[in-house]
Swiss-Prot record:
InterPro entries: Lipoprotein_YbaY-like, Pilotin
PANTHER family referenced in this protein's UniProt entry, alphabetically: GLYCOPROTEIN/POLYSACCHARIDE METABOLISM, GLYCOPROTEIN_POLYSACCHARIDE METABOLISM
Gene expressing this chain: ybaY
Biased composition annotated in UniProt, kind: Low complexity: 162-182
Protein name (Swiss-Prot/TrEMBL): Uncharacterized lipoprotein YbaY
GO CC terms, sorted: plasma membrane
UniProt subcellular location: Cell membrane
Signal peptide: 1-18
Main location: membrane
Region annotation (Disordered) ranges: 162-190
Pfam families: YscW (PF09619)
Length: 190
């Protein structure tokens, strides 16, 4: 009986020795000198987002102070202004189309039957020059990736205000709510 115990102990010892030999080949990275993970740190939680690319239909050179605004809005109510769920505005800094974007949103703001739209616009010197002219449903009806194509805004004569400047406004019911270029700090990465 003692012989059986000794033989099985020897077999286990040989098996463990063989396993230990194999694991010696696996290299583990050494921790950096100044990094430490505390028990209170948690990994970053990634919020849901909508991403895509903004294209301009015509070949045009945008000036460095052009501002691209991408907006995610809830246009569920026909007789009310759309509710902006997420918006990002950045100076193009001389970069040209296409522009990639990622808009994070709060999923609690999106109702299952909501009409969620994605739109974009470009302003130059506080004047609207390019907009999306088609409805781009996302999230509930269209997924979370969408490409947008911008078209030129038709220029029309506008009455001059007493202050001497013309105004270009976006109706409050439009899903594209833009920020004036003077309100967007520069430089910013998109």
């Amino acid at each position: 009986m003692k012989l059986v115990h000794m033989a099985s102990g020897l077999a286990v010892a040989i098996a463990l020795a063989a396993c230990a030999d194999k694991s010696a080949d696996i290299q583990t990275p050494a921790p950096a000198a100044n990094t430490s993970i505390s028990a209170t740190q948690q990994p970053a939680i990634q919020q849901p987002n909508v991403s895509g690319t903004v294209w301009i239909r015509q070949k045009v050179a945008l000036p460095p102070d052009a501002v691209l605004t991408v907006t995610l809005s809830d246009a569920s109510l026909a007789d009310a202004p759309s509710k902006v769920l997420a918006q990002k505005a950045v100076r193009t800094e001389g970069k040209q189309s296409p522009f990639s974007f990622v808009l994070s949103f709060n999923p609690a703001d999106v109702q299952p039957n909501a009409r969620i739209l994605l739109s974009a616009a470009i302003t130059v010197n506080d004047k609207l020059v390019f907009i999306t002219d088609t409805v781009q449903p996302v999230i509930n009806q269209g997924g979370t990736k969408a490409d947008l194509t911008l078209v030129p805004v038709q220029q029309t004569a506008v009455p001059v205000q007493a202050s001497g400047g013309a105004t270009t406004t976006v109706p409050s019911t439009s899903p594209t709510q833009v920020n004036p270029s003077s309100a967007v700090p520069a430089p910013t990465q998109y």
